[in-house]
């Protein structure tokens, strides 16, 4: 676990980078099932202990050509009653690596703080130079870690081979090309941190807990903040109508232990719904859509499906609302690809996004784009997306860290629980970027666990 940030950066193993628990799952476990979180923590510690006991097996397999059984036996014997000794040695290597990087980083940031008070041009030039230095120091620190880690596993210091004079120009040539590339990257990163303004989308129709999710009452408040879209959740009712509801079971919001598909629309809209200290009635989709059109507020409508839905649910939905949705510029999304297919079959001009709660493999679909949980999103996914004409929305962006990551990866839209915070972040990034802060954020990528 301690080595993941370093190993992932050195090896760039695709599936190792996938070992990430989505943030929304972590938050849900912490909030609802803390005991499950405790069990996961214990299992992680157990896995870490096992990895310590077996870490000397790999060098035996690769360098000594021993069998798996012999290598495992060797590692277990070597670490017997000495686990803490090796843990502290590993920790010390990691600490030294980070200290090495931090000590080089401090004068860079200090000089940038002083230069940021001068003209924009001077500050930008030094910022690019400092960006190049940070990238070089980053790779120097990784090299230092790799040398120390391999020496630790093998018990031997790496031999220093004498430099050959004919390689001198090649080394400087490679270094020069790398610095030019880093400088170009730094210019783009510092001068245009937001190359195109992302759409800002209200999550479940609320912002900063200003009301009850998915209700007309909250829509009226949230629309005043001028989001580009308001994300909503729609489910079918027992009588084939449509209601505004996110949860599969409505007990948490209404106190009634039932699914939306168990009650008629009339029964649902008579229920009181409470959240964030606010109280109102459950909203029908008709009432919500009419209010949105009245306010000229565009919606991102998520269709939530269940086994209790009627077979022709989407056909009826599109026949009833399709024309209105298209005329008013609304968009759709769903976790169920059958919904995507049926929307496109009805009218391919209606934007519809496929929701991906986890980034595993890149899907090949006809969707307008993808709505991705941000914490597992990576450059590999984005690079493949650039080869298509599809868009990317990310959720849920509620911090400067998640905003920075989304901007860096070029997200087309950000779904957030705090519209004003994200709007402010976009304004600062476009109009008054702080080079010291941007350099610091770039440096902190080295510490990304």
Task: Show the residue positions of the predicted features.
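Membrane-interface segments at or immediately adjacent to transmembrane helices
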Residues: 189-239, 243-244, 251-253, 259-262, ...
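C-terminal active-site rim and adjoining tail of enzyme catalytic domains
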Residues: 354-449
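Structural preference for beta-strand elements that scaffold enzyme active sites
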Residues: 197-201, 229-231, 298-300, 329-332, ...
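Metal-dependent phosphodiesterase/phospholipase catalytic core, i.e.
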Residues: 246-349, 442-448
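Conserved, mostly hydrophobic/aromatic
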Residues: 203, 222, 233, 268, ...
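Hydrophobic alpha-helical membrane segments
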Residues: 1-198
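Amphipathic, non-transmembrane alpha-helical secondary structure
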Residues: 216, 220, 224, 282, ...
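A cross-domain feature marking catalytic cores of carbohydrate-active enzymes
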Residues: 204, 232-234, 301-305, 334-336, ...
């Amino acid at each position: 676990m301690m080595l993941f940030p370093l190993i992932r950066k050195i090896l760039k193993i695709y599936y190792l980078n996938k070992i990430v628990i989505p943030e929304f799952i972590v938050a849900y476990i912490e909030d609802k099932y803390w005991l499950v979180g405790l069990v996961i923590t214990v299992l992680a510690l157990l896995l870490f202990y096992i990895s310590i006991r077996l870490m000397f097996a790999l060098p035996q397999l690769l360098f000594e050509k021993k069998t798996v059984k012999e290598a495992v036996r060797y590692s277990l014997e070597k670490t017997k009653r000495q686990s803490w000794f090796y843990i502290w040695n590993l920790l010390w290597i990691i600490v030294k690596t980070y200290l090495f990087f931090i000590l080089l980083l401090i004068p860079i940031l200090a000089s940038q703080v002083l230069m940021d008070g001068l003209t924009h041009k001077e500050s930008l030039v030094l910022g690019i130079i400092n960006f190049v230095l940070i990238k070089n120091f980053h790779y120097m620190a990784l090299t230092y870690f790799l040398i120390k880690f391999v020496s630790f596993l093998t018990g031997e210091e790496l031999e220093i081979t004498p430099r050959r004079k004919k390689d001198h120009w090649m080394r400087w040539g490679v270094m020069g090309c790398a610095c030019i590339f880093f400088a170009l990257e730094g210019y783009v990163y510092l001068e245009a941190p937001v190359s195109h303004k992302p759409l800002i989308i209200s999550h479940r129709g609320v912002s900063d807990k200003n009301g009850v999710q998915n209700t007309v009452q909250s829509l009226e408040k949230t629309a005043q903040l001028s989001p580009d879209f308001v994300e909503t959740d729609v489910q079918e009712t027992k009588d084939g109508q449509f209601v505004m509801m996110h949860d599969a079971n409505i007990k948490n919001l209404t106190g009634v232990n039932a699914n939306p598909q168990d009650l008629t629309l009339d029964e649902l809209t008579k229920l009181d719904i409470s959240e964030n200290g606010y109280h109102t009635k459950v909203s029908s989709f008709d009432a919500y859509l009419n209010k949105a059109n009245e306010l000229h507020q565009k919606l991102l409508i998520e269709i939530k499906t269940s086994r209790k839905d009627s077979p022709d649910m989407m056909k009826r939905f599109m026949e009833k609302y399709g024309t209105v949705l298209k005329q008013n510029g609304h968009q759709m999304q769903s976790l169920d690809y059958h919904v995507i297919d049926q929307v496109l079959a009805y009218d391919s001009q209606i934007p519809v996004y496929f929701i991906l709660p986890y980034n595993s493999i890149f899907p090949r679909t006809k969707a307008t784009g993808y709505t991705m949980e941000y914490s597992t999103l990576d450059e590999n996914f984005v690079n493949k997306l650039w080869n298509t004409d599809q868009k990317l929305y990310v959720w849920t962006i509620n911090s400067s860290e998640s905003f920075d990551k989304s901007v860096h990866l070029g997200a087309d839209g950000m779904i957030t629980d705090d519209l004003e915070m994200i709007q402010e972040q976009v304004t600062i990034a476009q109009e008054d970027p702080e080079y010291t802060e941007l350099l610091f954020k770039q440096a902190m990528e080295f510490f990304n666990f």
